[in-house]
Amino acid sequence: MFAKINHLAICTTNYAANARFYQALFGMKASNTQRPARAAPVGDGQVGLNNIPLRDGRRSGLDHFGFEVESIPLALERMKKFDPNLPAVQRPAVRPNAAWSAADHDMIIYDLAERDSGKAQDIFAENTGGELPRRYINHIALRATNPERSAEFYSTVYELPISNDRSGGSYRLSDGRVTLLILPWKMENFVGHDPEPPRLEHFGFKVESIEAVKRDLEEIAGTNPVMVTKPLGLGAEGKARLAVLKQCPIGQLQLTDLEGVHIDVNDH
């Protein structure tokens, strides 16, 4: 395929512990090249999940995602043809895993890396696909003001086919392994809790068993009190936030990581 989703980034003060959480619960792998003072990336064979130290003035939580593409010049050409006003900037050479950063019409940020460029480092060079692991990232979810236009954009520019499944008013596009789920952004979703702009909302894992994940989550928290996730659905606002997360037609069990990033899992 022309493009595949290869990158997610979380900004967190607990970047090292958060990376260990994803290793412990979901079996993600750390890079063979460790850089203790830098971000802590882990991978599932395709997606590199980068846990980034939170800097001043930056918002914590799920930050952006990224594509690996056959040709960055062609992707940029298609993007400008689709909408000349869409922004894209070339990144400094010190960030080899994200040659360019761009945004869709809702200003949802994503990175671009070119396949076989020889520039990938750390987990992004070590993610080589192969046999599906027992637990792996199988969808990322965006909230968009115009889901149909967003789906058209990602399909036209990145050749992600659009599924006929429109459950929950969503659009599903796939690179063959990871689904890009585009959900409608509605102000009505925020009547009971603080409003959020259109954004990268959550991501989810395909697992072998929901019950096994529940058992592992309890065992991990009992073994290591640092790895206790944020509570979901507590209080009126918590219930309202959880109700929005449950609008995802793929997720069956909802939880968070140590930073409070929303995750869901499915075994169907």
Go through each PLM region and give its residues.
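Conserved acetyl-CoA-binding loop of GNAT-fold acetyltransferases
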Residues: 24-31, 83-86, 156-163, 221-224
